[in-house]
């Protein structure tokens, strides 16, 4: 009998949506708008009519003042750009006999498609470690070999998307609520490669991505954590609410997500460390000094690669 995968204990609790459905860990927005007395956490109103994908990229209503909604032609170019970035990363980095970390979100789909093509064409022997329920389903859908960190604690290469990338290759991730498992897989990988479209390329974090930095928290601590973050660093902290269910988004780990909308550029390494020290915080969506290379699919059909100076 096959041993249960790393997320099997979560399925009975319905902590993640079924593929293709919104809600749970994959949704944002929704609910009514009010402030909790005596706290700095705000429960947002229905700012988005769309739903969040598995991670990384999101679909939002153009009525949301915090969202970036390009014209349809730009959106189609963005999807093509994701495909170009994903395929470039797979061609340049995936080799036979590797253990791969598979990220979450819409961009990673294109990378997995190309991995599956190469497995079939070149008879590659690859093992894939998922970062979320969505990633697990994607691995199975394309007939790739699924494993976990129990059996493969050392990962050769992790590929994932990002919500935003700054000039130093620091990332904001977690738009789809999978930030903790994404960071675990990236952290145990010998190489961490990021794929994104041209909209995610920024000089400073917050230039393009206006939904804030996700923070995964233990449910009982979301109010004191929200107060601590806003008092120490300013900005607004919101509890992420689900769309197709009543109440907050619940991660694959059974936790809540706070979105910290910061109001200035910070020293992100120091901020990341300080927030993680707050009791009740599981992890943040700040990926500092983790990405080795980032592939950006561009509007003109090219791929722009940026890497750390020492690589």
From Swiss-Prot:
GO cellular component, as recorded: cytoplasm; cytosol; mitochondrion
Enzyme class, first EC level, given as a word: isomerase
Pathway terms, separated by semicolons: Carbohydrate degradation; pentose phosphate pathway; D-ribose 5-phosphate from D-ribulose 5-phosphate (non-oxidative stage): step 1/1
Disordered: annotated segments: 22-67
Biological process annotations from GO: D-ribose metabolic process; pentose-phosphate shunt; pentose-phosphate shunt, non-oxidative branch
Gly residues bias (residue ranges): 22-32
HAMAP family: Rib_5P_isom_A
Protein name: Ribose-5-phosphate isomerase
The organism of origin for this protein: Homo sapiens (Human)
